[in-house]
């Protein structure tokens, strides 16, 4: 099993790098604004029809465009979800959502969180799934990538005032990147048996004579962008554990690759655009080392399982509870780490059924800001925030003004960096405390003790960091949780994006200075180690007390009792 686990990790990383490197080169061309003659007429037609000017924007114009675009998306999706009962493509005649669930879902999908307090096959019409959720899967992913584009340009340009055009970036990312790759992935999924139809649900009689309903729907098209855009919201309640959504080991492997594909490619693109590939490689090394260690720990924890099973006559202690036998423990563990390292949140097993240690690693990966490859766009700009913090700390140690890629990092930059890094931990800890201190919050906890605390902590960690996965033992479809988690998702998304664009606006105006004797090299092993240490230190200082009350306490209860 040990050899199989390392072989799985190695094969995954090799295929990921082989696919993401050429995509990184293509993304670099988009960032630098190189024209693509084949689609220039399509672009020109879009600008004429929409009346949008494609002139470059400064930082605040870019931020305003992104914010207004997403607020409009929330309103439109909210209305669609509320009125779906009166709209077509609803063969099961499902009614509209309650207002608080519709608001939660709209905010969730627009912010790329895809937190789901409902089961899709019992709640949403095909129109809501296609025109609502799938569309926002594309647009929310494009938003994250566009913000990353703006920040990369800020490092690459100097003595400038503009970061690009938000509308141009959103259109090009959607047309040139997301749609073509999603189409290829969708065809692969269909070949593996993922559903893609508009038929009504099938009502069948099993061999045992039991009546059963089989849900149908346009699953493959939504599934493709669900993983490619690190969205994570499943067509069905069981998400990628459902055989109609993720039927084979191959489809499972493709899903994991798709989740990391664009985040990894953006690192390659970053190095190419700033003119030093070592910078992108350093980020990839830091991310990969943390990722591999996390996967190994989860695999070990799930294989070790529960020591109390053997005395009861079980053949193995290994923890198969909540997992699909077609994937097994190793592939399930890898998927869990991939989906929480990225801001995806898709699951092929029930994370609530993981061991205490196995569940703590996905929880911790979210809490450090999902900077280990991370979401599309958000993973890169999240890690670059830690890069700025790292060079600041290094500058303090040697008594020099911090700089990165020839740009001086001043007081304003560090204030915005601190704000962006601290906003999500603040939301997580305050939200968890509020839920535990109120009767409405405690009413949703179905498991007592340390695990119940972990479920609440996981919910707010997932929402604030725009992941969307859950410890499903928490009952969250209530006005209290729907509204509080919606606020956490919105602030967690734009409370980071706005400071990032403020940093970009500051950096793009600065002159690039040549490296001196005292300049910290940021492309070598020393800096990679410092960066990893900074990520671990911030995560440890922020969340160790909370983790000690939840998964750590639960782990000790199991093993010390044994």
Swiss-Prot record:
Protein name per the record: Potassium-transporting ATPase potassium-binding subunit
NCBIfam families named in the record: kdpA (TIGR00680)
HAMAP family in alphabetical order: KdpA
Main localisation: membrane
Lipid bilayer topology: Multi-pass membrane protein
Family (UniProt): Belongs to the KdpA family.
Subunit structure: The system is composed of three essential subunits: KdpA, KdpB and KdpC.
Organism: Yersinia pseudotuberculosis serotype IB (strain PB1/+)
Localization annotation: Cell inner membrane
Keywords tagged on the record: Cell inner membrane, Cell membrane, Ion transport, Membrane, Potassium, Potassium transport, Transmembrane, Transmembrane helix, Transport
UniProt superkingdom: Bacteria
Described function: Part of the high-affinity ATP-driven potassium transport (or Kdp) system, which catalyzes the hydrolysis of ATP coupled with the electrogenic transport of potassium into the cytoplasm. This subunit binds the periplasmic potassium ions and delivers the ions to the membrane domain of KdpB through an intramembrane tunnel.
InterPro entries: KdpA
GO CC terms: plasma membrane
GO molecular function: P-type potassium transmembrane transporter activity; potassium ion binding
Sequence intervals crossing the membrane: 6-26, 62-82, 132-152, 175-195, 253-273, 283-303, 327-347, 356-376, 379-399, 416-436, 483-503, 526-546
